[in-house]
C-alpha cells in the first residue's frame, strides 16, 4: 500500500470554484528514500522500508551506520517506517508525490497533542455531578469500585489521568491539492499532532464505506 512520511505544517483554508471555503491541513514531505526491501520469498510478505529526515551523525550508532553503507549518498534517517504490499522500487530509490495523483483519499496517522493530567469529564466526556448548591461533588467521576466481590477496581476503568500523546489515525481524508514543487499536499480536515510533528500518509483503506 502506497505511503509516505510527512510533516504537519499547520491548517489553513482554500476556496473552491463554487465559493465554498474548505478547511485544510498542509502536509510537507522531505525526500523519502527506500532504505530496505522485504520479499515474499525471504520474509513471507512484500514491503518497502522507507526513511525520511536526516539524522545527526552524533546520534547514529555503528550498526545503523553499517546498514546505510550499502546505500549510496543516503544519510541515516530519523524516521523509518515499513509499508507492506508496496512494490516497484529498489533500495536507494527516492519515492515522490507522483502516486498521489491517482489517489483521492488518504489515511493519516500521527501522535495527538499531549494535554497532561486531566479529569474524567475532559478526558472521557463524563457528565459529572449536579452543579446545584446542594451537591457534594460537581466534576467527580462517580464510583469506580465494586462490592465485596470482586473488591477491586478493574484494569482499564475510565478515570482521571494523562491525556493525549497517543497514536491516532484519521481515515478517508480527501486530497484537495498537490504541490509537487513545494513537496506538499493539502488534505481536507484536521490531522492529529502539533505543528511540525511527523505523520504517516497512506492510501485510504475504506474508500466508499
Swiss-Prot record:
Keyword RNA-binding: yes
Keywords: Ribonucleoprotein, Ribosomal protein, RNA-binding, rRNA-binding
A Gene Ontology cellular-component term: cytosolic large ribosomal subunit
GO biological process: translation
Gene3D superfamilies for this protein: 3.30.160.810, Translation factors (2.40.30.10)
Region annotation Disordered: where it falls in the sequence: 127-151
Single GO MF annotation: rRNA binding
Highest taxon of the lineage: Bacteria
InterPro entries associated with the record: Ribosomal_uL3 (IPR000597), Ribosomal_uL3_bac/org-type (IPR019927), Ribosomal_uL3_CS (IPR019926), Transl_B-barrel_sf (IPR009000)
Pfam families, A to Z: Ribosomal_L3
Alphabetized PANTHER family for the sequence: 50S RIBOSOMAL PROTEIN L3 (PTHR11229), LARGE RIBOSOMAL SUBUNIT PROTEIN UL3C (PTHR11229:SF16)
Function: One of the primary rRNA binding proteins, it binds directly near the 3'-end of the 23S rRNA, where it nucleates assembly of the 50S subunit.
HAMAP family: Ribosomal_uL3_B (MF_01325_B)
Entry's family note: Belongs to the universal ribosomal protein uL3 family.
Binding partners and assembly: Part of the 50S ribosomal subunit. Forms a cluster with proteins L14 and L19.
Protein name: Large ribosomal subunit protein uL3
Gene: rplC
